[in-house]
Amino acid sequence: MAQPQNDQAQPPPATLTNPRFTLELEFVSSLANPYYLSHLAVNYPSLLGISKSGNENEVNDDNSDPDAEAFAAYLAYLYSYWKTPEYSQFLTHPGATLRALRLLQEEKFRRDIIRPQVIERLAGVDLNGEQSAAEAGEQNTEQNKGDRGNVENQHGKT
C-alpha cells in the first residue's frame, strides 16, 4: 500500500505564487459551478462512486472503488482547509464553492449529482430553464441573499 505524499498532508502556503495552491484554487473554484459537477458525474462516474450499471439503488460496499475512495479523501482534504478564512479569502464565490465542497463530503450527494434535477436545483433553475421560485425569492429579499440551504434540504427528497 502506497503511503500518501507528505506534501498533501499539509495544505500549500496560501500564496498565488505557489503552483500547487493556484491549481487547487482553480479546481475548488470550478466546483462552484453545478454544470461542472454534472460534467464530472457524467464523464468520471467512478470517481464519484456512481454505479456503471446506472442503477441508482445499487450500492456495493464490498467492492468499493479505490479511485472513488481516494477522490472522496481528496475532497475532504480540500474542504478541511479551504473553509478556513486564510484560504477562503481567495475564492471568488466562497458561498457556492464551500457549499459544493460540503455537499461532496456526502456519498449520497456524490452519487445523486448525475441526476439533472439535482444539478438544476443547485443552479437555481428549474428544468424548463426558468429561475426557480426559491431563487427568485432570495434575490428579492435582502436578508436571504446568499442563503442556499434549500438545496441541501431538497437534496434528500429527489
UniProtKB/Swiss-Prot annotation:
The record's GO CC annotations read: core mediator complex; mediator complex
Keywords (alphabetical) are: Activator, Nucleus, Transcription, Transcription regulation
Query: Mind listing the GO biological process terms from this record?
Result: regulation of transcription by RNA polymerase II
Q: Where is this gene product found?
A: Nucleus
Q: Where is this region: Disordered?
A: 130-158
- Keyword Transcription recorded: yes
Q: Which domain of life is it from?
A: Eukaryota
User: Per UniProt, what is one GO molecular function of this protein?
Assistant: transcription coregulator activity
Q: Which residues does UniProt assign to the signal peptide?
A: none
Which family does the UniProt entry place this protein in? Belongs to the Mediator complex subunit 31 family.
What this chain does, per the entry, is described as: Component of the Mediator complex, a coactivator involved in the regulated transcription of nearly all RNA polymerase II-dependent genes. Mediator functions as a bridge to convey information from gene-specific regulatory proteins to the basal RNA polymerase II transcription machinery. Mediator is recruited to promoters by direct interactions with regulatory proteins and serves as a scaffold for the assembly of a functional preinitiation complex with RNA polymerase II and the general transcription factors.
PANTHER family from the UniProt entry: MEDIATOR OF RNA POLYMERASE II TRANSCRIPTION SUBUNIT 31
Query: Self-association or partners: how does it assemble?
Result: Component of the Mediator complex.
Name of the protein in question: Mediator of RNA polymerase II transcription subunit 31
Origin organism is Emericella nidulans (strain FGSC A4 / ATCC 38163 / CBS 112.46 / NRRL 194 / M139)
Question: Gene for this protein?
Answer: soh1
